[in-house]
Design a protein with these regions (language model features):
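Short catalytic/ligand-binding loop motif for oxyanion handling, primarily in non-cytosolic enzymes
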Residues: 16-20, 39-41, 71-73, 93-98, ...
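Short, conserved active-site loop motifs that form the nucleotide-linked donor/cofactor pocket
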Residues: 29, 60-61, 83, 158-161
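PAPS-dependent sulfotransferase catalytic domain
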Residues: 44-57, 67, 71, 107-176
């Protein structure tokens, strides 16, 4: 298999873990999910350089899926010549509802002082919005995320693919991903069971 550099993304609670599994079970590909150390949303030169080195120094390329890659994609495209970006998109209301259930008393999307909302390590991995409620902020995050990835797709139309989360459950959807990544037919992974929403991350 040719050298393959892949960044996967999506808002989180959108099928990113399932995407990593679909890619990573293809023959000859190792695809991780949210490999550490995670990049914060705001640019950190040291952490960025470490992730970049993982891509540049691996003889077979590298593949990782993490929602927090979005603000760094333009920089990655400048630094990685053969980069492919895959983004999964789940319905806005489903992402908001899932995050509301998943995060409890944490609020990653609004600035806070730790009284109403608990401080959480993941706070640094998300952008902040001037919302009046947590669910409103998550909705604003969804809007920002998919607006931005579509702008990046317009800049790199051959190297960015956005797929609906549901496509991970279909042969047609998985073939679209494999075709985009130029994975040979014999190396492709076809799961017996479908991916279910409760497994989305």
């Amino acid at each position: 298999m040719a050298r393959l550099n892949v960044i996967g993304c999506g808002t989180g609670r959108s099928g990113t873990m399932s995407l990593a599994q679909v890619i990573g079970r293809c023959r000859g590909i190792v695809c991780t999910h949210e490999v550490r150390p995670l990049l914060p949303w705001e640019y950190d030169a040291k952490r960025y350089r470490r992730r970049l080195d993982d891509y540049l120094q691996s003889p077979d390329g590298s593949a990782d899926v993490y929602f927090g890659y979005l603000p760094h994609l333009r920089r990655f495209f400048l630094d990685i010549a053969d980069l492919k970006v895959l983004c999964v998109e789940r319905a806005r209301d489903e992402v908001v509802d899932s995050y509301m259930r998943w995060t409890g008393n944490a609020n990653h999307w609004m600035e806070h002082d730790g009284t109403t909302w608990a401080y959480n390590w993941w706070d640094r991995c998300y952008p902040k919005f001037p919302a009046t409620s947590k669910d409103e902020a998550i909705g604003m995050y969804w809007d920002h995320y998919y607006s931005e990835i579509r702008k990046i797709q317009a800049e790199h139309p051959s190297d960015v693919l956005i797929v609906p989360t549901e496509s991970l459950n279909t042969d047609e959807g998985r073939h679209q991903i494999f075709d985009f990544l130029e994975i040979e037919e014999a190396d492709r992974y076809h799961p017996i069971a479908t991916v279910h929403h409760q497994g989305f991350k």
